[in-house]
A protein has these predicted regions:
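Ser/Thr-rich, low-complexity intrinsically disordered segments
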Residues: 3-14, 25-38
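Short hydrophobic targeting helices and cationic amphipathic motifs
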Residues: 9, 44-46, 51-52
């Protein structure tokens, strides 16, 4: 196993160094060589212990990406090439601006994003394990406080959409813990990673990145400044860019769709479910019900939808006890 890892790493080193030699000064090349050698030493240190084949495979994947990382961050990367050739993007961003936005992808974050895609908790854990993350006394109590503080808003949203307010509470809790955990990654790094390194997500990520850049241009926001989830969702409700464009609404009618405002966020989560076959005048919150199926469109995971329903039920139960 160690011999295999060393052979892979030696090949990666050659490829990476050839890339560096083709595009850097001598000083930059020496810096790159030192960085690559340091990563190899760290990698070999890790595999010197009792690593399983699965863990070794993950380390090889991440370190191989780090060796080739410099190639994708250059103007000929798939991400930059796609944007430069897109007619809509051409009208609002120059080639130089696009290259500038992507000139410094965060390498450590790219590696973290790849690992997170491989270890999605809603996909890799059982329902019992996954639900324990979210169904806690602390989250339930926080949901009750949040609901009481925004009771009139929830009632107004319910009148318009007929979407259960406690289900919306549950989703807000799971997505960002009421705005506390909005994600640590720059969205440009999320989409860059998916386009460059995850072929099955490339086309999807290109659409999201394009819409995200259009949003940033219209709102006069620096794309590098927006952070969100590893998958590319942002704001209190964690909308992806295309869903933000089509389903996020200006609920308070102030002329702006605000992903960091609770009025628009609560209204938009309800609107999202309503537009995705949420059944009106239906109180069936069982697993595989029509309501469950609507929630599943928010995050296409059975565990997610089931946990959202369970958490909603627990919040409602405690609310009745308070009343």
């Amino acid at each position: 196993m160690k011999k295999l890892a060393k052979n892979i790493l030696q090949k990666a080193r050659v490829i990476a160094l050839v890339s560096e030699k083709n595009r850097t000064t001598q000083a930059d090349e020496l810096t790159a060589i030192r960085a690559i050698n340091n990563k190899i030493k760290l990698f070999l240190f890790f595999i010197s212990g009792n690593f399983s084949a699965m863990k070794l495979h993950k380390f090889i994947a991440v370190f191989f990406v780090s060796f080739l990382f410099a190639q994708s961050s250059q103007p000929n990367s798939k991400t930059i090439q796609f944007l430069i050739e897109d007619q809509q993007i051409q009208k609002i961003y120059s080639s130089e601006t696009i290259k500038s936005i992507f000139k410094n992808p965060q390498q450590k974050d790219v590696e973290k994003i790849l690992l997170k895609f491989k270890n999605k908790p809603e996909k890799t854990r059982t329902l019992q394990e996954y639900s324990k993350i979210f169904i806690t006394d602390k989250r339930i109590n926080r949901a009750l406080v949040f609901y009481v503080s925004n009771k009139n808003l929830f009632r107004e949203v319910y009148v318009q959409t007929k979407v259960d307010p406690f289900l919306v509470l549950s989703i807000i809790s799971m997505e960002t813990n009421f705005g506390e955990a909005q994600g640590e990654f720059r969205l440009i790094d999320s989409f860059f990673t998916q386009i460059e390194y995850i072929p099955e997500r490339k086309e999807w990520a290109e659409k999201q990145l394009k819409q995200f850049l259009i949003y940033c241009f219209n709102e006069k926001i620096a794309p590098e400044s927006v952070k969100g989830s590893y998958a590319g969702a942002f704001g209190y409700g964690q909308f992806i860019p295309t869903s933000f464009e089509s389903l996020f609404i200006d609920f308070n009618l102030d002329g702006k769709k605000d992903p960091y405002g609770w009025e628009d966020t609560i209204g938009s989560i309800s609107n999202y479910l309503f537009q995705n076959q949420y059944p009106v005048d239906n109180n069936n919150f069982s697993i595989n019900s029509e309501i469950w199926k609507s929630v599943r469109t928010y995050n296409r995971s059975d565990n997610y939808a089931s946990t959202a329903i369970y958490l909603r039920n627990e919040i409602l139960k405690e609310f009745y006890l308070l009343d």
